[in-house]
From Swiss-Prot:
The keyword Signal does not apply. It comes from Neorickettsia sennetsu (strain ATCC VR-367 / Miyayama) (Ehrlichia sennetsu). Pfam families: Radical_SAM (PF04055), UPF0004 (PF00919). InterPro entries: Elp3/MiaA/NifB-like_rSAM, Methylthiotransferase, Methylthiotransferase_CS, Methylthiotransferase_N, Methylthiotransferase_N_sf, MiaB_methiolase, rSAM, rSAM_horseshoe. GO terms for cellular component: cytosol. This is tRNA-2-methylthio-N(6)-dimethylallyladenosine synthase. It catalyses: N(6)-dimethylallyladenosine(37) in tRNA + (sulfur carrier)-SH + AH2 + 2 S-adenosyl-L-methionine = 2-methylsulfanyl-N(6)-dimethylallyladenosine(37) in tRNA + (sulfur carrier)-H + 5'-deoxyadenosine + L-methionine + A + S-adenosyl-L-homocysteine + 2 H(+). Monomer. Binds 2 [4Fe-4S] clusters. One cluster is coordinated with 3 cysteines and an exchangeable S-adenosyl-L-methionine.
Length: 471
């Protein structure tokens, strides 16, 4: 990992400045972070938490107790910006109530998309920072306090984000036995409905050795399951430290599988056009790789797929499904669907329903199309909200039926469950296929347990523990 003197100076300067402020005015102590959207944002928030903690702040679960509030935003769904401004309005009321200064940071994809417009519409915002510039938070916060002004940074440079961060920011707080690990960011596909290429930038992959070191570090902290993240994760092409060899996702998984204390590997989100033989081979040969693939198709209509600029047909997609099934017979799939994309006819929608019947997904996510400013889809003639709502309701009903059908087929079989979440009176975990399981036995927390399925509902399995296979 590269450690640059300039980064150390900035980080140290910000920390010293914050310490001076604390001594002078014992108020800038606590920070609160609210995360919206995808797993990548969850990962980024973990990085932000470590960065800000390094400045002397402590995490507060309540915004009301915080001196610094960070909103890590998502711009995928419609009205994301308006939801942000509504949230900032609530924070403004909190500021008036406390009659104290609260530093406000807007991070993430809405920050990247809106930029200075955020500060124009919400004067209480102090810092706007894009997702590829979160490593600059110490500098930006120090600048705001030093000059009592505003700070904004939205450069697209994932190399800085991943490689130039001071070592302190990489020592993650991992309270659970499962963790996310970002290996790839950005997207070059430019689907007609998606803002990711505009908010996350071009595709960038971390080096294989850097990913390996972070995975190894996570396992030393008790992590048993790692989910590899990327906007287009199977487009991963990381170099070895020598720079002379490039590994794809399948090869990376095979390498990570050699870490003894790592028990489970997952990855998300995949794009159908970037599948490769080594990934199929990994599913066939790497026992730590879960037999579950999230493979968004978006539509079952070739006409709509072309309109979306997805670059594959339903036949291409089904061939990929078949390749995975040939690699591992017990593999299952989840997907994403968008209904009501411009030009979608009743026949196009029926083709989507037919695809769902054919694949028999274990679970899926479904959305009605929402135009995103700056994307091609926003310029097309739109379908009525009434039609979109009707189709979404029909789609979700079918998806629930298929999910229940998949879960019911598990009754009488054994599954392995990693219990990684604690609730007030129970613990919960997930099977290989992402089904949720609850238990009253708190001794099973952070353990992988073989369980027999006794009953099933749409979203959960009822199981009886048989054996602990990993402590």
């Amino acid at each position: 990992m590269l450690l640059y003197l300039a980064d150390v100076v900035i980080f140290s300067h910000a920390k010293v400045y914050m310490e001076k402020i604390e001594k002078k005015n014992n108020s800038l102590k606590k920070f609160h972070i609210k995360t919206y959207g995808c797993q990548m944002n969850v990962y980024d928030s973990e990085m932000i938490e470590k960065i800000v903690s390094g400045l002397g702040f402590t995490l507060s679960e309540r915004a009301e107790d915080a001196d610094l509030i960070i909103l890590n935003t998502c711009n995928i769904r419609e009205k994301a910006a308006e939801k942000l401004y509504s949230e900032l309005g609530q924070i403004r009321l909190l500021q008036k109530k406390k009659q104290e200064r609260i530093l406000i940071v807007v991070a993430g994809c809405v920050a990247q998309a809106e930029g200075e417009e955020i500060m124009r519409r919400a004067e209480n915002v102090d810092v706007v920072v894009g997702p590829q510039s979160i490593h600059s938070l110490p500098e930006l916060i120090a600048k705001v306090n030093r000059q009592s002004g505003k700070a904004i940074k939205m450069e697209f440079d994932p190399i800085e984000k991943f490689d130039y961060l001071a070592e302190e920011t990489r020592k993650r707080r991992v309270p659970q036995s499962s963790a996310f690990l970002s290996i790839q960011e950005g997207c070059d596909k430019f689907c007609a409905f998606c803002v990711v290429p505009y908010t996350r930038g071009a595709e960038y992959s971390r080096s294989t050795e850097e990913v390996y070191r972070e995975a190894l570090s996570l396992t030393t902290k008790g992590v048993k399951e790692i989910t590899l993240l990327g906007q287009n994760v199977n487009g991963y092409h990381g170099t070895l430290d020598s720079g002379n060899k490039v590994l794809n996702l399948g090869q990376l998984i095979s390498r990570l599988g050699k870490i003894p204390s790592l028990k489970r590997i997952r990855y998300t989100t995949s794009h159908p056009v970037d599948m490769h033989k080594e990934l199929y081979d990994a599913h066939a040969n790497e026992s730590k790789l879960m037999p579950f693939v999230h493979l968004p198709v978006q539509s079952g209509s070739d006409k709509i797929l072309k309109q979306m600029n997805r670059k594959y047909t339903t036949a291409d997609y089904l061939k990929i499904i078949n390749e995975f099934q040939n690699a591992r017979s017990d593999i299952a799939f989840s997907s994403d669907f968008i209904v009501g994309f411009p030009g979608e006819s009743d026949d196009d929608f029926q083709q989507t329903l037919a695809l769902i019947e054919q694949v028999n997904y274990a679970q899926c996510y479904s959305f009605k199309y929402s135009p995103r400013p700056g994307t091609p889809g926003a310029t097309y003639p739109q379908i009525s909200e009434e039609t979109k709502n009707t189709r979404l309701q029909k789609l979700q009903q079918l998806l629930k039926e298929k999910q229940l059908e998949f879960n019911k087929k598990m009754i009488g079989k054994t599954v392995t469950v990693l219990f990684d979440k604690k609730h007030p009176d129970k613990i919960s975990g997930r099977t290989e296929y992402m089904q949720q399981v609850f238990s009253d036995d708190s001794n099973l927390l952070d353990k992988i347990v073989t369980m027999r399925v006794e009953d099933a509902s749409t979203f959960t399995l009822k199981c009886t523990a048989e054996d602990i296979i990993s402590t």
